[in-house]
Amino acid sequence: MSPLLQRMAQHPQLDISTVYCRLRGAKAGIDPEFGAKIQWDIPLLDGYPWVEIPNKGTDSEGFWGLYNPGLWRFVRQGNFDAVFCHTGYIRASFWITYLASKFSRSAFLFGTDATTLTPLDRRMWKRPVKRLFWPFLYRLASQVIAPSSGTWDLLRSLGIPEERISLIPYVVDNDWWKAQSAQVDRNAVRDSWGVDPDTAVVLFCAKLQPWKRPLDLVQAFAQAGVANSLLLLAGDGPLKEELQAETMRLGISNRVRFLGFVNQTQLPALYTAADVMVLPSQYDAFGVVVNEAILCGCAVVASNSVGAGRDLIAPIDPSFIYPCGDVGALSTLLRGILSDRPYLSKFRVAAGERMKTWSPREHIAATLEAVERGVSRIRPLS
């Protein structure tokens, strides 16, 4: 998010103030999903104005986990045309911000990245509750934000009018990823993995969590049986030992490397030196690793539960999307694409072209349009 905020801070039509309810992720700390202490190796707080409002809450994942009463004064005294809220509605701070915006006659923009009503924790009773509550919730917004086509369709299915929804694409800093990739010595990186330039390298880059379904990929890779191939698993998490045991059971441990947590500045080398990245998640609202990999010239295969598949992969080749959990389908897909290197090269080129219109430029333009719509709705021209 920080590269976008930096660009917005420099945009002549925007005057932004960024508020953090807490700095988790921006500073070193334990990431429970990685199961380790994480310190990102790029600056996340430079190049744009920001302030942290003290959190008086419990810092848990519940409603009172984020309770920042100072938001009321900040919004009320800020004289903002619009307030763009990224804090979820299950937090107290969301409602403080909403009420402060309403009393200030500031447009209030918020949205979701969900593409389905099915919750990540699979507690299915939440589906009918969301179906009843969300139409009311999103009508509170001056403009509703959708970062993908899948989210757009979900909001429309809930009865949110088309003119109340703005598609603001989920993007990364395209220029940075392409520039970093251009500096990578692909053969040298492969040498560090102990493989030659002709080895077919498959990459998994995500937390080793059950909903990311890395076991599907390990099993599909084994079934594919592609000669001279290597599977890289970049990431950490609670499934690591189970995955290592599975590679032993399948007899492929000599063709699988566990890289652990890989920091931001090291990722371009991974993507650039791999042939294809696979994201087998059972739920990924979008999955910006898809953006990153494509920008580094890596082909991408994803399950049909990955939001980025529809916007970034399907326009190039819908056959690179397979049914989530279907190990046989993924195995067949891997066997086919890894044996057709010329087509993989064509896919990379076409995907790179697609990213030219899915970039920070489009994101900021869509943000401006959404703000203008929201402001005009609460302050109509006389």
Predicted stretch roles:
Residues 196-212, 218-221:
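Conserved donor-binding/catalytic core segment of Leloir-type glycosyltransferases
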Residues 150, 171:
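Carbohydrate-associated surface elements
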Residues 92, 107-109, 116-140:
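Nucleotide-sugar donor phosphate/pyrophosphate-binding loop at the beta->alpha transition
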Residues 261-262, 269-274:
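Short alpha-helical donor nucleotide-sugar binding micro-motif in glycosyltransferases
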Residues 315-327, 336-341:
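Conserved acidic donor-binding segment of nucleotide-sugar-dependent glycosyltransferases
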Residues 299-303:
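Short hydrophobic beta-strand element within catalytic cores of glycosyltransferases
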Residues 191, 255, 336, 343-357:
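A short, well-ordered alpha-helix in the C-terminal region of glycosyltransferases
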Residues 282:
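Aromatic "clamp/platform" in nucleotide-sugar-dependent glycosyltransferases that forms part
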